[in-house]
Every structure is written in C-alpha cells, then in structure tokens.
C-alpha cells in the first residue's frame, strides 16, 4: 500500500462491549496488523447523557481479554478522549464561522418540533429550514439580538451545499453517493452545551490522528456524506471508508438487537460464562469475513496473516449461537486441563463443589463443555441422590429388561472390594452382566448409564462410575429401581 496504514476503534463509553462493536475493533486490528500499520483506540465521550461510569475501562478490558493490543490509546497518549479535545473542536468551529461555512442557529426545540409536525402533515420529507431564509441583514441582526436577550443559547450548523454530490468508493460496498439536498438541510455541528456533534468531532479527530482508513458498521453509511461535507469545508482529504454489513440473528433473520435478551451479545457475558477468549475471537473474526476454504479454526497469528479486506462480505453476517458453541467446545477440548480447571474453580467454589475430586471431574467433562460454567449442571449427578430424567430417559427405563440389568450390575458393584473398585475393572463387570443375563447393546449399557448418571450420553461410563464412587453408584441404582417399580 502506498500510504501508512492508521486505523482506529473509537467506542463511546456508554455500556458493555457489544459483539458488533467487538467485530469493528477486531477487523481494524487485523487490518492494521496484516499491513504493518497502526491500530489506535480513541474514546468518543461527547454524549454526556449516555456516558456510563467505568464504561471506558470495561471496553478496554474486554478488548484485552479477546487478545487484542493497540499502539496508541488514552492510556499512553494525551487527548485521546474527545472530552479532552474541546479546544481543538472550537478552533475549527470558529474557522468555519469566520469563513461563512457555518452559522449560529437560535431556533428552539419547540420550533423544530412544530416544523417537523407541519412537514409530516403536508407529506414533506423532514428537513431543517434555514431560519434566516428571506431575512435582510438588518432583520437577521434584530432576530439574533432578540433571541440572545431571551437567553436562548445557539447551536452551530454547517451550511450544506444542496447541489453537491458526496461520493466515495467503499472498501466493502463499492461506489456510493449522496446528493447534498437529501441530507436533511443544514445540520448541527456544535450543541448548545458547547460539545461538538459526532459527525463533526469524528472528522477533526480522524484528520488530526492521520487516520488512513475508516472501517466500521454499515449503520454509519448515512453519516459518511455529512463527514465528507466537513472534510470539504475544511479543505482536507478524506480517508478511505469501508462499511461492514450488519449482523443478523441466524434464527430470526432479523438484525441482531441489543434488546433481544435471549441471545448473548456482550463480551462480558461470554467472559462470565467461561468461554475461552480465543474461541470468541475466532468466532467474531468470521462474522462477515472468511479466508476461503473449509477450515474455520484459526489462531490469532493465522488470522493476521490471512486477513484480506477484499474478502469482507457484502451480505449480512449471521450470528449463530450453535456455531459459537461448537467452536468454543473445540477450543475447550484442546485446551490444557490446568487452564480449564483454573477457569472452573470459581464456579465450583460458588456451588460448594471444589472437592478433592474437582480436577478429575473437570477432566472428565472437559470434552463436553461449550462454556466452563457448564461444569455445574454436568456434575449434578455427583452431588444429588436422584437425577431428573427427561421423557426420553424415562421411556428407556420402562423396558422390561431394565430391572434385571440394574439388579445384576448392583450386585457386581456390591461384590467388589475397595481395592478392586478401579476404572479398568468396571467395564468387565458390565460384560459379566451381559454374559449372565444375555442382555446386550443399548439394552445393557443405557439403563446403567441413565441410572448412574441421569444422562443418555456422556463421558466413558467406567470413568463416571469410578469418580462417582462405589457407594454412590449403588445408591443411584437403588433409587432408580425404586422409581421404576412405582
């Protein structure tokens, strides 16, 4: 590439890190690292009403958890928060006012609302009508004096070139253009509280920080012509823009909504449930981008090497919880036991299950986990007297040979000494039941598994029985025999 790559992730500290924002950060990170460029974090905190205490720390902490690092941020550089850059914004506001490219607007919220209502009733497209339209200089001066005397604080609006065409070649979408007359009229670049609006401040920041490429969600497409107007007004070259497609819920086909509480959408949620960060990183990196081929599991280093902005998808990215869980399970299965056990300890401790067998239990169920918090429901059988059965499990236990199998296996366990009760001796006892009763296959193994564990599927049965212990295994079988005899 001919110019230095400088990209940014610029969150507002208004809450937890959403998976859509995490994707924006991740694609900027991969783009910078692939091209040997600079990835920076800037905090856009001009919306004081939505500001959340500790929101900035939460954003950075969750990005680090995902495995991202950055070259510049408020932690290492001054004035990387918009609230620290107000003097810079004011400098360019004053410049545009002096050049007649912006003006102070004294129209009130009530007047704006009344005009919007009139336009709606008339079937007109909502837009701001310049309040000075048709005024002479004397009338304009009198209007301003009257408004200021009434204590009305003005906003500052950019004078829009209604006949202008604002176009760019989007890295993802291709050629896009807007007519200046379709923007909604002159728009506010400075609010009454002195803070700049987003579409003004972001241009000043990107220019000042020499951002070369702006990669973000396609909900920002409508913002781009306004930003191009500011670049034009200040005589600056705009960066390249790339707008990633939205993320949809794979089950509903609708845009992923933060209000959909049935879907985990915040990185903090995945951390709390015990997903591995590498798995979440991997999953997010494939939301709207893929390297080609059939493989879907890649390390961070492989993603950096493979990342190609030309493969950013033009179609919506499907958020598929089942795919994330499959991917997470793959990472957990292949992680070392020490890592997963350390992650499981808080869950086990809270449930009162951090016993001397805890690490063995984690080892036993690690291949089944989609998230580490599942260690609790998976190990319920070790801490209860009778497992809850599903309809399918109850149906299996109504088989006419079930009591015969359970009585025979219970007798085998009772006959074993403590020294004999080891994992490798348990399967031969099951085979002995088969030989004595003539019952085999599912009719043999399934009743024993369900009676002991309350599950139709799970780890190797001898491993489960050994960890459960001889006495508790016998107790579970006795409880099941009582249940099925009712």
Swiss-Prot record:
<keyword id="KW-0067">ATP-binding</keyword>
<feature type="short sequence motif" description="'HIGH' region">
    <location>
        <begin position="11"/>
        <end position="21"/>
    </location>
</feature>
<dbReference type="InterPro" id="IPR000924">
    <property type="entry name" value="Glu/Gln-tRNA-synth"/>
</dbReference>
<dbReference type="GO" id="GO:0008270">
    <property type="term" value="F:zinc ion binding"/>
</dbReference>
<keyword id="KW-0963">Cytoplasm</keyword>
<dbReference type="InterPro" id="IPR045462">
    <property type="entry name" value="aa-tRNA-synth_I_cd-bd"/>
</dbReference>
<dbReference type="Pfam" id="PF19269">
    <property type="entry name" value="Anticodon_2"/>
</dbReference>
<keyword id="KW-0648">Protein biosynthesis</keyword>
<comment type="similarity">
    <text>Belongs to the class-I aminoacyl-tRNA synthetase family. Glutamate--tRNA ligase type 1 subfamily.</text>
</comment>
<dbReference type="GO" id="GO:0005829">
    <property type="term" value="C:cytosol"/>
</dbReference>
<dbReference type="GO" id="GO:0006424">
    <property type="term" value="P:glutamyl-tRNA aminoacylation"/>
</dbReference>
<feature type="binding site">
    <location>
        <position position="258"/>
    </location>
    <ligand>
        <name>ATP</name>
    </ligand>
</feature>
<dbReference type="Pfam" id="PF00749">
    <property type="entry name" value="tRNA-synt_1c"/>
</dbReference>
<dbReference type="InterPro" id="IPR014729">
    <property type="entry name" value="Rossmann-like_a/b/a_fold"/>
</dbReference>
<dbReference type="InterPro" id="IPR008925">
    <property type="entry name" value="aa_tRNA-synth_I_cd-bd_sf"/>
</dbReference>
<dbReference type="InterPro" id="IPR020058">
    <property type="entry name" value="Glu/Gln-tRNA-synth_Ib_cat-dom"/>
</dbReference>
<dbReference type="GO" id="GO:0000049">
    <property type="term" value="F:tRNA binding"/>
</dbReference>
<comment type="function">
    <text>Catalyzes the attachment of glutamate to tRNA(Glu) in a two-step reaction: glutamate is first activated by ATP to form Glu-AMP and then transferred to the acceptor end of tRNA(Glu).</text>
</comment>
<feature type="short sequence motif" description="'KMSKS' region">
    <location>
        <begin position="255"/>
        <end position="259"/>
    </location>
</feature>
<dbReference type="InterPro" id="IPR004527">
    <property type="entry name" value="Glu-tRNA-ligase_bac/mito"/>
</dbReference>
<keyword id="KW-0436">Ligase</keyword>
<dbReference type="GO" id="GO:0005524">
    <property type="term" value="F:ATP binding"/>
</dbReference>
<dbReference type="InterPro" id="IPR001412">
    <property type="entry name" value="aa-tRNA-synth_I_CS"/>
</dbReference>
<protein>
    <recommendedName>
        <fullName>Glutamate--tRNA ligase</fullName>
        <ecNumber>6.1.1.17</ecNumber>
    </recommendedName>
</protein>
<dbReference type="InterPro" id="IPR049940">
    <property type="entry name" value="GluQ/Sye"/>
</dbReference>
<comment type="subunit">
    <text>Monomer.</text>
</comment>
<dbReference type="InterPro" id="IPR020751">
    <property type="entry name" value="aa-tRNA-synth_I_codon-bd_sub2"/>
</dbReference>
<keyword id="KW-0030">Aminoacyl-tRNA synthetase</keyword>
<dbReference type="InterPro" id="IPR033910">
    <property type="entry name" value="GluRS_core"/>
</dbReference>
<keyword id="KW-0547">Nucleotide-binding</keyword>
<dbReference type="GO" id="GO:0004818">
    <property type="term" value="F:glutamate-tRNA ligase activity"/>
</dbReference>
């Amino acid at each position: 590439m001919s110019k230095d790559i400088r990209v940014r992730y610029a969150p507002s500290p208004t809450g937890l890190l959403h998976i859509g924002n995490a994707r924006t950060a991740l694609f900027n990170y991969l783009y910078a690292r692939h091209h040997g460029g600079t990835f920076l974090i800037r905090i856009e905190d001009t919306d004081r009403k939505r500001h959340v205490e500790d929101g900035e720390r939460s954003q950075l902490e969750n990005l680090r958890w995902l495995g991202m690092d950055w070259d510049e941020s408020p932690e290492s550089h001054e004035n990387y928060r918009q609230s620290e850059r107000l003097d810079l914004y004011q400098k360019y506001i004053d410049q545009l006012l002096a050049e007649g490219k912006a003006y102070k607007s004294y129209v009130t919220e009530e007047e704006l609302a009344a005009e919007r209502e009139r336009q709606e009733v008339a079937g007109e497209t909502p837009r701001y009508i310049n309040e000075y339209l048709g005024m002479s200089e004397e009338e304009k001066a009198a209007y301003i004096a009257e408004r200021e005397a009434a204590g009305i604080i003005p906003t500052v609006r950019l004078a829009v070139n209604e006949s202008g065409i604002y176009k760019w070649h989007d890295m993802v979408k291709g050629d896009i253009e807007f007519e200046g007359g379709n923007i909604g009229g002159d728009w506010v670049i400075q609010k009454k509280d002195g803070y700049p609006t987003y579409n003004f401040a972001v241009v000043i920041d990107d220019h000042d920080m020499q951002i070369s490429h702006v990669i973000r969600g396609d909900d920002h497409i409508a913002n781009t012509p306004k930003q191009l107007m500011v670049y034009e007004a200040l005589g600056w070259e705009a960066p390249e823009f790339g707008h990633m497609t939205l993320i949809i819920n794979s089950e509903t086909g609708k845009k992923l909504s933060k209000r959909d509480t049935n879907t985990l959408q915040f990185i903090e949620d995945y951390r709390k449930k015990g997903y591995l960060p590498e798995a979440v990183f991997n999953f997010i990196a494939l939301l709207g981008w893929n390297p080609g081929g059939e493989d879907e599991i890649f390390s961070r280093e492989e993603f950096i090497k493979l990342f190609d902005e030309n493969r950013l998808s033009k179609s919506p990215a499907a958020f598929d919880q089942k795919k994330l869980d499959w991917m997470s399970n793959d990472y957990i299965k292949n992680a070392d036991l020490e890592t997963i056990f350390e992650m499981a300890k808080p869950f086990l401790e809270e449930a009162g299950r951090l016993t001397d067998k805890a690490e063995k239990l984690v080892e036993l169920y690690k291949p089944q986990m989609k998230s580490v918090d599942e260690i609790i429901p998976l190990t319920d059988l070790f801490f209860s007297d009778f497992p809850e059965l599903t309809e399918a499990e109850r149906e299996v236990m109504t088989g006419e040979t079930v009591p015969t199998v359970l009585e025979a296996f219970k007798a085998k366990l009772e006959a074993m000494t403590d020294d004999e009760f080891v994992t490798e001796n348990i399967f031969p006892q099951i085979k002995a039941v088969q030989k004595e009763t003539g019952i085999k296959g599912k009719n043999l193994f399934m009743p024993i598994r369900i009676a002991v564990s309350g599950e139709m599927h799970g780890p190797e049965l001898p491993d489960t029985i050994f960890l459960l212990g001889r006495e508790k295994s016998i107790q579970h079988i006795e409880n099941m025999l009582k249940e099925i005899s009712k």
